[in-house]
Amino acid sequence: MKKQKGISYKTKGWMIVLLLPITITIYILAIIGWQQLVKIPVVQEWAEIINSSTAKLDVPTEYIELYKKAEDNYGVPWTLLAAHHRIETRFSTMDPLLSPAGAEGHLQFMPCTFVGWSHPSCGGLGKGDIPEKDKISPAIIEQYGGYGVDANNDGKADPYDLEDAIFSAANYLAASGAADGEIEKAVFNYNHSEKYVEDVLHFYHLYESQVKNLQAAAYSSQ
C-alpha cells in the first residue's frame, strides 16, 4: 500500500494566508449586517423582549410577604401581583412613580380608578381633578366606588404606600376576574393593551415556574 501524502506545511501556510482575509471580511460583514438588522422594527421588538426577559428577573424577597398577604385577602395569585409590579414600575425603582398620563404610585393607578369613576371630575383616561386629600381618603373612595385600599390601617389609602398599592391592585384584579381564574381578562382590564397583557403574563408564568425557589428565598431572608 502506498503511503498517502498529506498536505505540505507550505500548502497549509498558503491556505491560511488566503483564508484569513476571507474570514475577517465575513466577520466584518456580519457585524455590519447585524447593525442594519437591529433597525428593523420586528427585530427591535424581539430584542426588547429578550432584554426585558433577562433584566431584573428576581422578585425582591422583601416584597413577597406583602404579595402573599394580598393574595390571602383577595384570592389573586401573588405571582400575578409581582408581575404587575415588575411591569408597572420595575418593582418601584421607577423615579418618579408618576406617569405622563397621570398614573400614580407603585402600581400606577389612574386617580379615577383608585378613587372611583363616579367622582364628578372623572372622565376620559381617568386623571380627573380630585383634591390630594380626597385621593387618599378611604371614606371618599368608598363613596365613589374606587379600588383604593388602606391595607396598613393608617387611615389613608395611598397609591404611594407600597402595601396600600399592592392591596389595591389585588382588589382591582380580583374584581376583574383574577380571583376566579380569569387572569388574562383581569390583566387586560388593568391596562387595555395586548402588549401589556403579553408582558405581564410573561412574568406571571415565569414567576409561577419559580415559585418554590422564590418563596424559599423570601423565607431564608427573614
Predicted regions and their residues:
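Hydrophobic membrane-insertion alpha-helices, especially the h-region
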Residues: W14-I32
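N-terminal Lys/Arg-rich, disordered targeting/topogenic segments
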Residues: M1-G13
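Catalytic glycan-binding domains that act on GlcNAc-containing polysaccharides
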Residues: V38-Q222
